[in-house]
From Swiss-Prot:
<feature type="region of interest" description="Disordered">
    <location>
        <begin position="15"/>
        <end position="148"/>
    </location>
</feature>
<feature type="region of interest" description="Disordered">
    <location>
        <begin position="309"/>
        <end position="368"/>
    </location>
</feature>
<protein>
    <recommendedName>
        <fullName>Topoisomerase I damage affected protein 11</fullName>
    </recommendedName>
</protein>
<feature type="compositionally biased region" description="Basic and acidic residues">
    <location>
        <begin position="65"/>
        <end position="75"/>
    </location>
</feature>
<feature type="compositionally biased region" description="Low complexity">
    <location>
        <begin position="348"/>
        <end position="366"/>
    </location>
</feature>
<dbReference type="InterPro" id="IPR031388">
    <property type="entry name" value="Tda11"/>
</dbReference>
<feature type="compositionally biased region" description="Low complexity">
    <location>
        <begin position="29"/>
        <end position="45"/>
    </location>
</feature>
<feature type="compositionally biased region" description="Basic and acidic residues">
    <location>
        <begin position="400"/>
        <end position="422"/>
    </location>
</feature>
<comment type="similarity">
    <text>Belongs to the TDA11 family.</text>
</comment>
<keyword id="KW-0963">Cytoplasm</keyword>
<feature type="compositionally biased region" description="Low complexity">
    <location>
        <begin position="131"/>
        <end position="148"/>
    </location>
</feature>
<dbReference type="Pfam" id="PF17084">
    <property type="entry name" value="TDA11"/>
</dbReference>
<feature type="region of interest" description="Disordered">
    <location>
        <begin position="203"/>
        <end position="255"/>
    </location>
</feature>
<feature type="compositionally biased region" description="Polar residues">
    <location>
        <begin position="114"/>
        <end position="130"/>
    </location>
</feature>
<feature type="compositionally biased region" description="Low complexity">
    <location>
        <begin position="210"/>
        <end position="226"/>
    </location>
</feature>
<feature type="compositionally biased region" description="Basic residues">
    <location>
        <begin position="85"/>
        <end position="97"/>
    </location>
</feature>
<feature type="coiled-coil region">
    <location>
        <begin position="155"/>
        <end position="208"/>
    </location>
</feature>
Length: 422
């Protein structure tokens, strides 16, 4: 409820008036006529008529006459009887509110106004009529109806707005569906175009690759045709060079190694001659003679010296003869190698590379045989060359066939004899 309705109900309770209906009449009695008004008339059927049930016709506002003007001077009266009517101006300034009419009692006029009684009631109470203007006839029912109307209008507006929103959403959904269909169609078209482009590109690549392969094959064939004579010439040239180098290197390798061997042999021979002739010994040590050796034992005991009671001249002469024989052998072998070298050169000029290899093998065999001869001559492995004159005083054999040598230390002290067994 509104505050206005509460105010209306409160005033109705105070005045004992029901303002829910508009066509109601209120009879207000004066104090003098209170007794008369208390006695309510009874209907023939025995029902008591209350004040609230007494109705008055609704008056419409009319234009006031000059006589009804409130500022008119009533002292200068005429012969006409003055009839006083309840005016709106007399009650409007006594109201508490502009919207709620207030009923106030009115004293009777001395001039004897004519009162109208509703239904011919004999009571002398003053009847106050309620104003029936549109502004003052506001009631609780009208406020309730207005509130209901306002809520109904609001609900209708909300309903209409919701329906419009739903329609707009449907329209948008349809538009989006159409857009999706268009996008799908465009996508399918693009996919087809892409497939076509791929097929075109693959075909172009295959054609280009085939052309490139053909061009490469043609270029390779042309290069082979151009390079075949050059390659043949180069191969022939390399073969010639290899043959020349093989002959040169073969001869150089064949004759460089024997020369080195010859130098080594020469040094070994000189060393052995010096040891055999005792060029490094002093005259006092000439008594100490080297013991002759037999095989490898002679090499180990070459540094051992032993005294000899009798120094035969045949030993020195045999040693000198052996050295001369060795020198003669070396000279003969060198001559043979030089002859072989000359023959090898002639064969290189006349024969092919196969003959050169055979000659090289033969030369190597000759050189190794010469090396073996020199070795046997230097080390004295052959025992047939030994003569019975090369016996040493003091040498003897045991029962087991082992030779025993008596040697002395190389000192100026008296000779100390020591026994060595072999």
């Amino acid at each position: 409820m509104n505050k206005f309705d509460e105010f209306v109900e409160a005033t109705d309770k105070e005045l004992h008036v029901d303002t829910s209906t508009r066509n109601t009449t209120i009879n207000v009695s004066s104090p003098g006529s209170s007794n008369d008004s208390t006695s309510s008339p009874k209907s023939p059927s025995g029902e008591v008529l209350s004040r609230k049930e007494m109705k008055m016709k609704q008056f419409t506002p009319k234009k006031l006459n000059y006589q009804d003007h409130p500022l008119k001077d009533h002292s200068t009266g005429g012969s006409l009887p003055i009839t006083r009517r309840t005016s709106r101006s007399s009650t409007i300034h006594k109201r508490k509110s502009l919207l709620q009419p207030i009923v106030a009692p009115q004293t009777p006029d001395k001039s004897g106004p004519s009162w109208r009684s509703n239904g011919g009631s004999p009571s002398g109470s003053f009847n106050r009529q309620r104003s029936t203007s549109g502004a003052s006839m506001h009631s609780r029912s009208s406020s309730q109806s207005l509130s209901l109307d306002s809520t109904f209008d609001v609900s209708l507006q909300n309903l209409a707005n919701k329906e419009l929103e739903l329609l707009e959403s449907k329209r948008r959904i349809e538009e989006l569906k159409k857009q999706l269909q268009l996008e799908e169609q465009s996508y399918q078209k693009r996919v087809e175009e892409l497939k076509e482009l791929k097929s075109q590109v693959s075909n172009d690549l295959q054609i280009n690759s085939q052309h490139q392969q053909q061009q490469q094959q043609q270029q390779q064939q042309q290069q082979q045709h151009h390079l075949q004579p050059h390659s043949k010439k180069r191969e022939e040239h390399t073969r010639d060079k290899s043959r020349g180098k093989g002959s040169g290197t073969g001869s150089s390798s064949v004759w460089s190694k024997p020369l080195a061997f010859f130098n080594q042999f020469d040094q070994i021979i000189q060393h052995e001659l010096e040891r055999s002739l005792r060029w490094d010994d002093t005259p006092e040590d000439k008594i100490m003679q080297p013991e002759p050796y037999e095989g490898a034992a002679a090499v180990q005991n070459s540094q051992l010296r032993q005294p000899q009671v009798e120094i035969p001249t045949s030993n020195s002469q045999s040693n000198v003869n052996n050295t001369d024989n060795n020198d003669n052998k070396i000279n003969n072998n060198t001559n043979n190698t030089s002859n072989n070298k000359n023959g090898h050169d002639d064969n290189n000029n006349n024969n092919d590379s196969s003959n050169n290899n055979n000659n090289n093998d033969g030369n190597n065999k000759n050189l190794w045989s010469f090396f073996n001869d020199v070795k046997t001559g230097l080390l004295g492995i052959e025992e047939e060359e030994e003569t019975p004159q090369r016996t040493i005083a003091g040498s003897a054999k045991n029962d087991n066939g082992i030779k025993e040598f008596k040697t002395a230390k190389k000192t100026r002290d008296p000779v100390e004899m020591t026994d060595f067994q072999k």
